Amino acid sequence: MFRNLYAEEARHNQTNITMGKMLKMDPVTYSRKKKNGSFTVTEAKKLTEFFGVSFEYLFETEVET
């Protein structure tokens, strides 16, 4: 769902396991949230701070034309 989130994880060599630990959640929960876009505001803020990018960039979605 969030291609830039996937890209930043790859650039920083992060896995669902390490990201889940950082957000204090199970890796499976993190993976589900990544797929369905259900991050809380607090979780989204932690992710943007961790990767050092803007919310708009990290959570940009593809727009179909």
Give residue spans per PLM region:
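Alpha-helical residues within the helix-turn-helix
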Residues: A10, K21, E49
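Residue-level signal for the short linker/turn that defines the boundary of a DNA-recognition helix
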Residues: N13-Q14, F39-T42
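Residues in the helix-turn-helix
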Residues: T18, V28-T29, Y57
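Recognition helix of helix-turn-helix/homeodomain-like DNA-binding domains
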Residues: M25-F39
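DNA major-groove recognition helix of helix-turn-helix
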Residues: K34, E43, E62
